[in-house]
């Protein structure tokens, strides 16, 4: 069978309603010249407006989206579970100097737990939300597959290595996590993090740093 797989997508204007940006043209050129020969990945940190209407074909793998030749919403494979687990759970947190001269899957998290006293600036804060988003997406995958224990395990592990006491969690991610715990029946975690979220938002309201719209 020599049938050629074809996928179609619509590139919407990214400059008003009349044109597309230089970086969009560059990505189109990369896809055109490399799709048949090598994998193409787009960073999860670039924002949805950089995906050129390819969202249906972008599968999450760690902190990148891989361009795949099938609609992820039809297959249910919004994330690559095997790759995600390799990166998010193989963290080598107890072997902080375990560096190798070759590729090893897994993110190395250090100084992000309750025992740390490191300083974090806004760049660190934003990056940690990307990592947390990956854990939440993996948990969502397990929920859709009716694997509740793995979903709870994923959230618990995330909170162990990236403590909300050390690195503040964005309000929308925090609320999403709390409600997932509730959905899964993990009421101890729901109560614990729910109270932390309420305290956090209450403090912001007092300081006029939160919008209730």
Task: Indicate residue ranges for each PLM-predicted region.
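ER/secretory pathway lumenal C-terminal domains and tails of membrane proteins involved
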Residues: 1-213
């Amino acid at each position: 069978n020599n049938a050629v797989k074809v996928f179609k997508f619509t590139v919407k204007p990214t400059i008003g309603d009349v044109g597309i940006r230089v970086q969009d043209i560059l990505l189109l050129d990369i896809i055109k010249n490399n799709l048949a020969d090598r994998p193409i990945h787009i960073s999860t940190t670039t924002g949805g407006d950089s995906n050129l209407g390819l969202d249906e074909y972008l599968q999450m793998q760690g902190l990148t989206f891989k361009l795949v030749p099938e609609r992820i919403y039809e297959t249910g494979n919004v994330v690559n579970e095997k790759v995600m687990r390799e990166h998010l759970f193989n963290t080598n947190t107890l072997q902080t100097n375990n560096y190798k001269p070759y590729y090893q899957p897994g993110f190395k998290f250090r100084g992000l737990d309750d025992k740390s006293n490191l300083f974090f600036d806004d760049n660190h804060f934003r990056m940690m939300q990307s990592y947390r988003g990956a854990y939440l997406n993996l948990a969502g995958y397990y929920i859709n597959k009716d694997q509740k224990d793995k979903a709870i395990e994923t959230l618990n592990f995330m909170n162990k290595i990236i403590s909300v006491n050390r690195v503040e969690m964005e309000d929308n991610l925090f609320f999403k996590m709390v409600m997932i715990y509730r959905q899964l029946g993990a009421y101890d975690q729901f109560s614990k993090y729910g109270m932390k979220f309420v305290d956090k938002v209450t403090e912001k309201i007092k300081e006029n740093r939160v919008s209730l719209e």
